[in-house]
C-alpha cells in the first residue's frame, strides 16, 4: 500500500512508503524532473527553501516552508507545484508556496 500525501495549500506532495527516484517541479510553462541521485543539499527556513542538485537549484518562497525543508531532507517529496496566479496571494493558509524558480547552475 502506498501513502501519498497531497495538500493543495502546500503545493507539494510526498510519498512516505516508496523510494522516490525523482522530484518533479511543475512551473507555469515548464516542468523539470530532477533525479534524487543528484541531490546535494537543501537549506532555508520558514519563508524560503533552496534545494540544490548537481546542475539545478530549486528556490521556493512562501510561508510555513520548514515542513518542506524536512520533506526534502528525507527525500520524500515527489512534486513541487508553482501556484496559479490567484493562489499566490492567499494569506489564510499556514503553509503555502508563493513562488517557485528553477535555475541552472554554472559549471566551473
Regions found by a protein language model. Name each.
Residues 60-108:
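Helix-rich interaction surfaces within compact, conserved domain-sized segments
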Residues 33-45:
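Phosphoinositide-dependent membrane-docking surfaces
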Residues 45-56:
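Short acidic, Gly/Pro-enriched loop/turn segments at secondary-structure junctions
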Residues 1-17:
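Anionic N-terminal interaction surfaces
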Residues 40-42, 56-59, 66-67:
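Short, surface-exposed beta-strand-loop junctions and turns on beta-sheet-rich folds
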Residues 19-33:
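Short aromatic-glycine motifs in intrinsically disordered, low-complexity regions
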Residues 13-16, 41-42, 51:
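Short, exposed beta-strand/loop patches in secreted or surface proteins that constitute
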